[in-house]
């Protein structure tokens, strides 16, 4: 009896061991499953495919794990250097990767090849970021935003689009923001107003602007390419493209400005009870049955009369004119010519209503440069309308960075940070330089050197007399240069 009981106990124990014994199974040798985030059976880790996670045997030292089949070096036969790229990095030749096979981050004896992964289009657009001159040092506030990377708001009926730059994408640009907007022929920018002050310049086509201020003064004007307008905070206004459409750049004096936060007349009507609208406008309730049920922002419109006077409605305060005018026809202002290009200045001196908006529209010929300078009291917000350029920004005490710019890029340089703009292409650079200041001013480094006692300069920088004697006591703004950008590759000569 005892023996039978013992046999039954042993049998039960054997069965229990069989139930709880863990089973280990290896994937079948013929399995062709690929490693990835999920197997062919979804997220089922119990399938016979490779597991989502590896085993503990992969931790730490694994013998014979290296493979000689993947090299981080790009063979010399697979790339070429751009003209001027092999020159001493201290010279900082402004070379281009435009026609270079497989560009590499090499300058003189600095750098090494890059096997990727890479986006070659970025490298070609930014040779001085990819292979910077040796004068670059430390960290500098990010100074570039390509508008081509801004999200584009496109409107129904092919009426237009809008994209913007603000501190969301360029965090250091705290004093100003930009909006690039396009209106199709006869399309409107909806009646609106802003908390920020608005300065605008026409980039393409032509536009009719209309506004009314607190004193009941009205204003209507037609603007062409290069012309400017300004609307103070709170002044309601509208824009209508004329027959060829219009694109314009808007600059606002708030770095965190968003055009999505604009006050719109459609939204204002929607956010008031119809009873209130009826009482305020002394109109029957049914007159408000057709108001839009959503904002319009940009909308197609009826062609405007050719004569702007037909849409000029004098108010109790009359029509704004003279120093109260909201527009300035910069396209008709003669440019100040220099051997290297030209400059037009528009600030409250000649456009009084734009009290703290001072700008320079600068043209730089190939090989020339906007001289090294800084602005003492204002950050500089810039927009490149044409051409290719590079800018080196020096931020005290020891930081410097060189950045490439092309048409459609926005630049931003902090107050007192020195910088220049050098044309690195074969066409003119056209650049808008914007300040928050009552007058457009800058500090010219060359002028400073000339107007400082020579011995102080010689003792400090060890510059020769011939250099100091050749400097002008006047600002040059745009300095002529050699169109052959690689002329100094040998280490001698004048740029």
Residues covered by each model-derived region:
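Fungal secretory targeting signals
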Residues: 1-29
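A short, N-terminal "cap"/entry segment at the start of jelly-roll beta-barrel domains
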Residues: 26-175, 279-361, 371, 462-495
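Ligand-binding loop in jelly-roll beta-barrel domains
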Residues: 26-29, 224-225, 230-264, 379, ...
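Intrinsic, low-complexity N-terminal interaction/targeting segments
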Residues: 160-162, 166-170, 177-180, 189, ...
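Short acidic-glycine-tyrosine-enriched beta hairpin
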Residues: 173, 183, 213-234, 364, ...
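Glycine- and acidic-residue-biased ligand/ion/polar-headgroup-sensing regions
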Residues: 185-188, 193-215, 366-397, 407
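Intrinsically disordered, low-complexity regions enriched in proline, serine, glycine
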Residues: 191-193, 210-212, 219-220, 241, ...
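Active-site-adjacent segment of 2-oxoglutarate/Fe(II) JmjC oxygenases
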Residues: 245-305, 428-483
């Amino acid at each position: 009896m005892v023996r039978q009981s013992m046999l039954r106990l042993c049998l039960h124990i054997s069965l229990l061991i069989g139930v709880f014994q863990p089973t280990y199974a290896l994937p079948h040798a013929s399995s062709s499953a690929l490693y990835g985030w999920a197997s062919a059976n979804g997220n089922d880790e119990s399938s016979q495919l490779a597991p989502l996670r590896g085993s503990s045997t992969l931790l730490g030292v694994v013998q014979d794990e290296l493979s000689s089949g993947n090299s981080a070096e790009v063979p010399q036969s697979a790339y070429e250097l751009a003209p001027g790229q092999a020159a001493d990095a201290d010279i900082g030749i402004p070379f281009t990767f435009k026609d270079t096979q497989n560009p590499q981050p090499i300058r003189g004896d600095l750098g090494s090849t890059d096997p990727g992964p890479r986006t070659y289009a970025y490298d070609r657009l930014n040779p001085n970021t990819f292979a910077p001159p040796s004068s670059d040092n430390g960290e500098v506030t990010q100074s570039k935003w390509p508008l081509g990377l801004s999200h584009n708001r496109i409107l129904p009926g092919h009426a237009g689009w809008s994209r913007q730059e603000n501190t969301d994408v360029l965090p250091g640009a705290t004093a100003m923001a930009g909006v690039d907007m396009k209106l199709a022929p006869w399309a409107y920018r909806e009646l609106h107003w802003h908390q920020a002050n608005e300065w605008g310049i026409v980039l393409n086509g032509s536009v009719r602007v209309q506004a009314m201020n607190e004193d009941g003064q009205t204003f209507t004007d037609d603007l062409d390419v290069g012309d400017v307008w300004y609307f103070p905070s709170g002044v309601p206004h509208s824009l209508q493209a004329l027959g060829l459409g219009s694109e314009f750049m808007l600059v606002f004096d708030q770095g965190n400005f968003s055009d999505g936060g604009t006050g719109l007349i459609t939204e204002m009507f929607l956010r008031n009870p119809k009873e209130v609208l009826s009482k305020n406008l002394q109109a029957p309730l049914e007159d408000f049955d057709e108001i839009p049920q959503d904002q319009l922002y940009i909308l197609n419109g009826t062609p405007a009369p050719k004569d702007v006077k037909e849409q000029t409605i004098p108010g109790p305060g009359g029509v704004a004119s003279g120093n109260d005018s909201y527009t300035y026809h910069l396209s008709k202002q003669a440019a100040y010519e220099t051997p290297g290009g030209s400059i037009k200045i528009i600030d409250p001196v000649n456009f009084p209503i734009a009290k703290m908006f001072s700008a320079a529209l600068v043209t730089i010929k190939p090989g020339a440069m906007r001289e090294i300078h800084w602005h003492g009291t204002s950050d500089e917000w810039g927009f490149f309308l044409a051409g290719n350029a590079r800018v080196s920004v020096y931020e005290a005490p020891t930081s410097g960075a060189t950045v490439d710019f092309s048409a459609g890029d926005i630049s931003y340089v902090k107050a007192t940070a020195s910088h220049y703009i050098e044309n690195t292409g074969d066409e003119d650079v056209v650049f808008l330089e914007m300040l928050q200041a009552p007058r457009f001013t800058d500090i010219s480094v060359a002028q400073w050197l000339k107007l400082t006692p020579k011995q102080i300069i010689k003792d400090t920088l060890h510059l020769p007399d011939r250099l100091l004697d050749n400097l002008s006591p006047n600002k040059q703004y745009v300095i002529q240069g050699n169109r052959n950008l690689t002329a100094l590759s040998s280490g001698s000569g004048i740029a």
